[in-house]
C-alpha cells in the first residue's frame, strides 16, 4: 500500500528590511539624526571633540595652565607653542583646553540643576493648578521681569566668584526660566484621557506624576537642556569677561578675552582669536545639536 508523504511546511520569506525596529528610542534618535540632520550631526561631532579635548587636556599639552615663562612673552604660533603665548608667557593652547574643561563643567553642572528645578516647578505647577499654579507663575513672572545678567551680577557680587557659586546661580536662574516651558507641556499632558483613567483606577498623585507625566515631559527636558548649554556657556563667558566668573588662575574663555583687551589686541591678536573661536564653536555645536534633537523629539516637527 502506497503511503503519501506529508507535504513540507510552507516557507515564509521575511524581508528583514521591513521588520519593525526594536532599537531603544534614544538610539533611534541618534540614527535618525545621522540620516536626516547633517547640521545636528556636525554639532554632535563638535561637542564630542570638545568633550574629549577637555577630558584629556592633561595628556595633550606638556604645560600647566598657570605655568609662566617671562622669557617667552607674546611668542607667536610655533612648534613649541601651537597657539602662541600670552603677556606672562603662558601657553595659549593649554589655557584654551583647560578653559573648555571649566566651561563644560559649569555648563553641565548648571544645566543639571536647571533641569531638576524646571522639572519640579513645571510639573508641580501644571499638575496641581489653581492657586498653586497662580502663585508659582507670578513668582516666575517677577523673576523674569528683571534683566537676567544684572541679577546674576548682583548675586555673584554678594557671594563672590567661584566655580561652585557660578554653577549654582546659573543653574537656578535657568531652571526658573525653563520651568515655564515644562509647565506648558505638562499642562497639555494632564488633559489627556489616560491621566483621568489612571486616576479612576486608583493611581495616586505620585504614580500619575512619575509614571504618566514625567516620561512624556522628558523629551522636552532633553531639548531644553541641550539648547540651554550654549546659553549657560555664553553667560559664564560674559561674567568671566566682567571679572565675576571663575577666578584666576583658572582659565576661562571669557577671562582670556578680558585679559587680551585692547592693549594687546594689535600686538598679539591670537590672545583674543583662539578663545573666541573656541567659544563660538561651543555655542554653535550645542545650538545645532539642540535644534536637531528638538526636530526629532517634538512630534509636531518630526516631519521637518
Please provide the spans of the model-predicted regions.
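Cytoplasmic juxtamembrane interface segments
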Residues: 28-46, 203-220
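Cleavable Sec-type N-terminal signal peptides
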Residues: 27, 45-56, 116, 120, ...
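A short amphipathic helical element positioned immediately N-terminal to and/or at the very start
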Residues: 26-36, 82-85, 93, 210, ...
Amino acid at each position: 500500500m502506497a503511503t503519501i508523504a506529508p507535504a513540507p511546511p510552507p516557507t515564509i520569506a521575511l524581508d528583514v528590511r521591513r521588520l519593525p525596529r526594536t532599537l531603544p528610542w534614544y538610539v533611534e534618535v541618534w540614527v535618525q539624526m545621522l540620516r536626516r540632520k547633517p547640521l545636528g550631526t556636525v554639532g554632535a561631532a563638535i561637542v564630542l571633540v570638545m568633550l574629549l579635548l577637555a577630558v584629556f587636556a592633561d595628556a595633550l599639552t606638556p604645560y600647566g595652565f598657570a605655568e609662566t615663562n617671562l622669557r617667552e612673552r607674546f611668542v607667536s604660533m610655533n612648534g613649541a607653542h601651537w597657539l602662541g603665548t600670552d603677556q606672562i608667557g603662558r601657553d595659549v593652547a593649554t589655557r584654551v583646553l583647560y578653559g573648555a574643561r571649566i566651561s563644560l563643567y559649569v555648563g553641565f553642572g548648571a544645566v543639571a540643576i536647571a533641569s531638576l528645578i524646571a522639572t519640579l516647578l513645571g510639573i508641580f505647577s501644571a499638575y496641581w493648578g489653581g492657586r498653586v499654579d497662580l502663585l508659582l507663575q507670578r513668582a516666575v513672572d517677577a523673576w523674569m521681569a528683571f534683566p537676567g545678567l544684572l541679577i546674576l551680577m548682583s548675586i555673584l557680587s554678594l557671594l563672590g566668584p567661584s566655580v561652585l557659586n557660578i554653577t549654582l546661580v546659573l543653574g537656578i536662574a535657568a531652571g526658573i526660566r525653563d520651568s515655564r516651558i515644562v509647565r506648558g507641556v505638562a499642562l497639555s499632558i494632564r488633559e489627556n484621557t489616560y491621566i483621568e483613567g489612571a486616576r479612576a483606577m486608583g493611581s495616586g498623585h505620585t504614580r500619575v506624576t512619575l509614571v504618566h507625566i514625567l516620561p512624556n515631559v522628558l523629551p522636552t527636558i532633553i531639548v531644553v537642556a541641550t539648547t540651554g548649554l550654549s546659553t549657560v556657556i555664553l553667560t559664564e563667558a560674559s561674567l568671566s569677561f566682567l571679572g565675576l566668573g571663575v577666578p584666576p588662575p583658572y582659565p576661562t574663555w571669557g577671562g582670556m578675552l578680558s585679559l587680551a583687551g585692547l592693549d594687546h589686541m594689535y600686538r598679539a591678536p591670537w590672545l583674543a582669536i583662539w578663545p573666541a573661536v573656541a567659544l563660538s564653536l561651543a555655542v554653535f555645536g550645542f545650538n545645532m545639536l539642540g535644534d536637531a534633537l528638538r526636530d526629532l523629539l517634538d512630534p509636531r516637527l518630526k516631519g521637518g
